[in-house]
Amino acid sequence: MPRKGHIAKREPLADPVYGSTLANKFVNSMMWDGKKSTAQGIFYEAMKKLEAKGGGEEAIKLFKKAVENAKPLLEVKTRRVGGANYQVPVEVNADRRTSLAIRWLISYSRGRGEKGMIDKLANELLDAANGRGAAIKKKEDVHRMAEANKAFAHYRW
């Protein structure tokens, strides 16, 4: 722990096209080997496809809705008490919520069956915006796990 207090969190830069810090975080999370221009190209093309498939709704609104729908409210953390391990449900703070949602959307996009990351990402974002898709299923699984272990909530620390 630092002796001089907490370090202030830097405000992330906004995305050059949409002016959204969330979009920039998404691109940074999607980037491999420092190839940001490649990640941006994939993201922007996916957003174009998302707008085409989205039924007239703006792509950035659909994107924000998808991330919002994928954010978990609760998760379980393992806590050791008296030789036994308990899955203790805890609330997820706002920054972690966003990063988990982004991480899940990207990983489940990569795992989809379509050809090309642009199509995979566009379809996963569209599914998440409509309350379907693998990222939403993951969120529901995490919530179900927290609900099942509600009896151990008093072990929170």
From Swiss-Prot:
Keywords: Ribonucleoprotein, Ribosomal protein, RNA-binding, rRNA-binding, tRNA-binding. One of its GO terms (biological process) is translation. PROSITE patterns: RIBOSOMAL_S7. One of its GO terms (cellular component) is small ribosomal subunit. InterPro entries: Ribosomal_uS7, Ribosomal_uS7_bac/org-type, Ribosomal_uS7_CS, Ribosomal_uS7_dom, Ribosomal_uS7_dom_sf. One of its GO terms (molecular function) is structural constituent of ribosome. Pfam families: Ribosomal_S7. One of the primary rRNA binding proteins, it binds directly to 16S rRNA where it nucleates assembly of the head domain of the 30S subunit. Is located at the subunit interface close to the decoding center, probably blocks exit of the E-site tRNA. Part of the 30S ribosomal subunit. Contacts proteins S9 and S11. Belongs to the universal ribosomal protein uS7 family. This is Small ribosomal subunit protein uS7.
